[in-house]
Amino acid sequence: MSTSEILNLNPQGVWKYFHELNQIPRPTGQMEEVTKFVMDFGKSLNLETRQDKTGNVLIKKPASKGYESGKTIIIQSHLDMVPQKNADVIHDFSRDPI
């Protein structure tokens, strides 16, 4: 899928960040750049953003007005990727975006 096709998917804001994230090589053990990307993302939205001792990134968003007594939602994800490719494909996951 081309960049323009990705950026024209809806909702466009989600796919914009998906595309930016996929420009960052991030095999296991090489997560500095993707960690910075996610930390900067949280901070750019003025959200409480921190990294714990083990390297996890935590972003906290307060409840929307009127929903303060609602249940808490947690979204969890890995920042790294386990690279896989066919033997005949030339791709360096430590430096090439996907």
Feature roles, as predicted:
Residues 19-22, 42, 46, 83:
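Structural signal for hydrophobic packing residues in well-ordered secondary-structure cores
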Residues 8, 45, 86-88:
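Intrinsically disordered, low-complexity boundary segments flanking structured domains
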Residues 68-98:
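Active-site metal-coordination/substrate-binding segment of hydrolases
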Residues 27-74:
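A non-catalytic alpha/beta surface segment that caps or lines the substrate-entry region
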Residues 1-24:
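N-terminal hydrophobic or amphipathic helices/low-complexity stretches enriched
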